[in-house]
Each structure stands twice: as structure tokens, then as C-alpha cells.
Amino acid sequence: MSGHSKFSNIKHKKEKNDAAKGKIFTITVIGREIAVAVKEGGPDPDNNGKLRDVIAKAKANNMPNDTIERGIKKAAGNIDAVNYEEVTYEGYGPNGTAIIVKALTDNKNRTASNVRNAFTKGSGSVGTQGCVSYMFDEKGQIIIDKEECDMEADDLMMIALDAGADDFNEEDDSFEITTAPEDFSAVREALEAENIAMASAEVTMLPQTYVTLNDENDIKQLQRTLDLLDEDDDVQYVYHNWDE
């Protein structure tokens, strides 16, 4: 599960039970993102900001360069390429918790059925488009571990703000930068140009308010939904407003 800093606790990060599964999962998830980025903006990273962001994420997750290049060529040449579509589902968990699911799929019927099953088994329900997304703000989010950064906080803040960041926060063990979605790439690339290591860098959904679950059964039910979504390879990201 995710941590308890100001921003990082709003996204249930997909995790697997062991390192081998985690490696396979990372390649699967990012491989699909590469395919979609190439489809939307072409195979040249210099002319495709979304692809640059995905490549940066792939490298941050230790994906080999040849795997990245093979994914780009495969998507660009349509050689055995799968046509993935981006789909979003919104719904409710116990006690009105809001959940957003983003998936990349080659079979929307299969994915919709699996997502609906995950909600139902956790005593939740899938709603209509827009039923909970208004409770979240789409933002770029960059987290920098203090242990991995030698730069002074003020200098780091100026680099981020000059590049277009909206906000800069210092936590106990990290710096957290937020941006508008359209400014995310510029801020990430400005930090990258200064050789600043980023623990994570992505466009995410930040909840405007949080829901606390005090009933043990509610917690177990929501956890069941999140676990089932974790196990679905079509699901890329799950966002919620549970204050863990």
C-alpha cells in the first residue's frame, strides 16, 4: 500500500507479492503505455512528450533500454502489435469511498466485467462516468527522496517553480512537487537536466477530501476491491480517497 505523506497516500500503487511478479508487471504496464503513447504521438521521443514521460518512467523502474526500444518499434511498425484502448471506470467503495480505475485494454468487455466484479466483491459498485471524478484534481506529481538529493531545498524549489510547478512541499523524508498536467513534462525535464533523481514522477489524481474508515469490515471490503484490481493486468492505476 501507499504511504501517508500529503499526496502519496491517495494512490493505491499496484504491487505484486514477489520481485519476479513485480518485474513482469512493470514491463506489462509500461509496455502498454509505450504502445498508446506511440499510437497517439509517433515513435520519436523528441516530438512526443508523452512518450518521453513514459520512457523516463520505464528507466526509473529499471526497464532495459532494449526492451523500451523494442516496445517503441513494435508499436510503430504494428508488427504483432496489440491495439490498446484507454478506459476509465468510477465507483464507490464502503462508506462512500470514491475510486477511479484507469486501464489499458484490448478487450473492453473483459475489463469492464473484471472491474465490476472487483467492486461487487468488496461491497461497492461501479457508477457512471463523472460520478466521483469531480472529487479529484488531475495533477502532475513528482517525489524526490531527500537521501538521493544533494541540492538545497530552496534551489530545488526554484528549479521546479521556474519550470512551471504549481507547488513545492518539504516532507520529513522527501520533497513533493505538484504541477498542472500540461506543465508536468517541462518540470520533470528541468529536474532531469539537473541530474536530480526522482523517486516517482507521474500525472495522478489527487482527492479534494478524504474518507476515514473506522469499521474493520469496511476496511476489509475496500482492501478486497483494491487487491482484485491489483491482480488485473488490464488495470494500470487505481486512485481513491480513503485516508489509510
For the regions a protein language model found, what residue spans apply to each?
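Positively charged, low-complexity, intrinsically disordered RNA-binding extensions
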Residues: 141-244
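N-terminal cationic and glycine-rich segments that engage phosphates or anionic surfaces
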Residues: 1-127, 132-143, 183, 240-243
